Amino acid sequence: MVSVSEIRQAQRAEGPATIMAIGTANPANCVEQSTYPDFYFKITNSEHKVELKEKFQRMCDKSMIKRRYMYLTEEILKENPSVCEYMAPSLDARQDMVVVEVPRLGKEAAVKAIKEWGQPKSKITHLIFCTTSGVDMPGADYQLTKLLGLRPYVKRYMMYQQGCFAGGTVLRLAKDLAENNKGARVLVVCSEVTAVTFRGPSDTHLDSLVGQALFGDGAAALIVGSDPIPEIEKPIFEMVWTAQTIAPDSEGAIDGHLREAGLTFHLLKDVPGIVSKNIDKALVEAFQPLNISDYNSIFWIAHPGGPAILDQVEQKLGLKPEKMKATREVLSEYGNMSSACVLFILDEMRKKSAQAGLKTTGEGLDWGVLFGFGPGLTIETVVLHSVAI
């Protein structure tokens, strides 16, 4: 008779979880940051708020963002005036948009990832879908299964309302699934649409205005599995270790609340300080077992919640400016896409590493770290090992 331990052994993969493909997608509507304050105050009928507009212009100028992509066009916003007001009841209108657009944008990214992977979609065993945009039953995971034509017995995990740290969460979950289920191939999708958070400006809620200056729409998809099939599946990054922690004394630092007026966003001024104060401890826990204490010797992927967070992390750790190059590039070209951001940065890094003729997918380095920061304040840490190009 076979023992339980023998069964468990047979169920486990041999090697580490590996990212085998990455795909990204954005809505067609591209918004230039330099002209966005004019558009935003006009479409929300707020042009009479001259001082507030000047303040918003300064926020946009300091954001280090050149452009963003948004599902919400001028036409859609004119058809839905309640979405343009500051706190008008508008949840139904927002939900009607995102329950369709979130899985649709997710499909676009997933199709690209599956194509790069090069295997038939029938070999996908698990699906992890993550969004902070809207809630529905059956969920966006179900809708994507239908849109892609996945097998009905794909094992699905739906993560709603997690916020900006969740790009790290999906990697942590995908790692555990791939390593504990031999032959598993996990499709990971993060799809974010700002139709839930868009609203007009308010003199009394400036943190909402910060969100209006930063957030953009995007979806990213990965294929994750252990023991890549030689000559068929090409590894990009290996996931070696993961952790999640709540930063001490950080309650209320980042909050989001789903209300009749949509998803409201609340932010304390000291978020960059809280992140930078706690990042050293997270790094020691992650890299001490590898005997790494020089954080300039690893590659960096950090959720770009905003430029101030990146600046303070660099300053606290004495990081060279080029360490955050891929992160800042994604912030500049797409804005803060919540959970999808770090997956976009993975894609940016492996592409630029290949273009520059470097020896690994991680800017020529062997080891790297991926950080997610979000409500809680929650910090996700993923230790990555690059692959030879």
Swiss-Prot record:
Pathway(s) the chain acts in: Secondary metabolite biosynthesis; flavonoid biosynthesis
PROSITE patterns membership: CHALCONE_SYNTH (PS00441)
Reactions performed catalytically: (E)-4-coumaroyl-CoA + 3 malonyl-CoA + 3 H(+) = 2',4,4',6'-tetrahydroxychalcone + 3 CO2 + 4 CoA
Keyword Chloroplast on entry: no
MF term (GO), any: naringenin-chalcone synthase activity
GO BP of this protein: flavonoid biosynthetic process; polyketide biosynthetic process
A Pfam match: Chal_sti_synt_N
CDD domains: CHS_like
EC number: 2.3.1.74
Residues the record marks as active site: C164
Family per similarity comment: Belongs to the thiolase-like superfamily. Chalcone/stilbene synthases family.
Biological role: The primary product of this enzyme is 4,2',4',6'-tetrahydroxychalcone (also termed naringenin-chalcone or chalcone) which can under specific conditions spontaneously isomerize into naringenin.
PANTHER family on file: CHALCONE SYNTHASE 7, HYDROXYMETHYLGLUTARYL-COA SYNTHASE
Protein name: Chalcone synthase 9
Organism, scientific name: Medicago sativa
